[in-house]
Design a protein with these regions (language model features):
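Active-site-adjacent helix-turn-beta-strand microarchitecture at beta-sheet edges
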Residues: 28-96
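Metal-dependent phosphoester-hydrolase catalytic domains
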Residues: 139-147, 155-267
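A long, amphipathic alpha-helix that forms part
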Residues: 122-144
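Beta-strand-turn-beta hairpins that frame and shape the catalytic cleft
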Residues: 67-68, 91-116, 264-267
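Catalytic metal-binding/acid-base residues of hydrolase active sites
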Residues: 25-26, 115-117, 153-156
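Extracytoplasmic/secreted cell-surface and envelope-processing proteins
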Residues: 29-32, 56-58, 120-123, 156-160, ...
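N-terminal, active-site-proximal structural segment of metallo-dependent hydrolase catalytic domains
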Residues: 1-38, 48-58, 246, 250, ...
Length: 267
């Protein structure tokens, strides 16, 4: 937990992001321990998490300084049946976790935290997840000035041209397509010797016309958070958390986080 907190507090002058999207959280008690014992400097409000249908018992969650605007909700993703007996897939996947917040000035932001079906699922399952995400975003955009989706999309470099560029980009601004042009990725596949942007932040293009609200994605702010030495191997690749042979902790996560800021423009 201390290492996770170190990475979070390394941003925004030691305060961490105003809104943090988290994946693979065990339960609300663990997240509250992280907030209260290790993230006091961030002054986050009580953690936000709803237990979902994941078979492994992991969920998406939020830490934020923004006030809630309504009750959080889970939106299930229905996956089509896999008829190939050689494919071992999960029967359920993580739901889309929605929480709505008040921005400075009173505008409403809808945040959709996601953790899409893993790579061993067929690509159709990630397509279905993208379709469901669009439905949820369209509904959220009826009341919110801006809708964000962020988390682990599990879209690797082989699927990215179809899923990110051809499908998602029609409805969303995607961090690594809008900015971060020199960024390599958030996850490294050692077997393929290739980076992937499994993780991203997306801003919905639909809903209330952008001309009618002042909050926009700032492409120049987009970057991969990987400057902390504890996050990386000597090669620069992500180093997942482990206890080494000497009993010492090493690493933080096998994914690097993504950072993005919204900018307020005059109407």
């Amino acid at each position: 937990m201390e290492r996770i907190a170190t990475v979070i507090l390394s941003q925004n002058n030691g305060k961490g992001a105003d809104l943090v999207f988290l994946c693979e959280v065990e339960n609300i008690s663990v997240l509250e321990r992280l907030r209260q014992e290790y993230l006091q400097a961030a002054a986050y409000r009580p953690a936000i998490l709803l237990e979902g249908p994941d078979e492994r018992g992991i969920d998406c969650a939020f830490l934020t300084r923004l006030p809630l605007d309504g009750s959080p909700a889970l939106h299930p993703i229905t996956l089509s049946k896999v008829n190939d007996p050689s494919k071992v897939v999960e029967r359920t996947t993580r739901a889309i976790f929605q929480a709505d917040f008040k921005l400075p000035g009173g505008e409403r932001l809808s945040a959709l935290a996601i953790h899409f079906p893993a790579g061993f699922h067929p690509i159709e399952h990630r397509k279905e997840a993208l379709s469901r995400l669009k439905e949820v975003a369209q509904d959220a955009a009826k009341k919110s000035q801006i809708v964000l989706a962020a988390g682990d999309f599990n879209i690797n470099f082989k699927e990215a041209p179809e899923l990110y560029n051809n499908i998602a980009a029609r409805d969303w601004q995607i961090t690594h397509l809008e900015g971060c042009k020199e960024c390599e990725g958030t996850y490294y596949y050692a077997k393929d010797e290739h980076w992937s942007f499994l993780d991203a932040i997306m801003v919905f293009k639909g809903g209330i016309p952008a001309a009618h609200h002042r909050w926009k994605m700032d492409p120049d702010s987009i970057r991969i958070v990987n400057e902390n030495v504890i996050q990386k191997k000597k090669t620069g690749f992500p180093l997942k958390f482990m206890i080494d042979k000497d009993g010492e902790p090493r690493g933080v996560s096998d994914h690097f986080p993504v950072w993005m800021q919204l900018k307020a423009e005059a109407l």
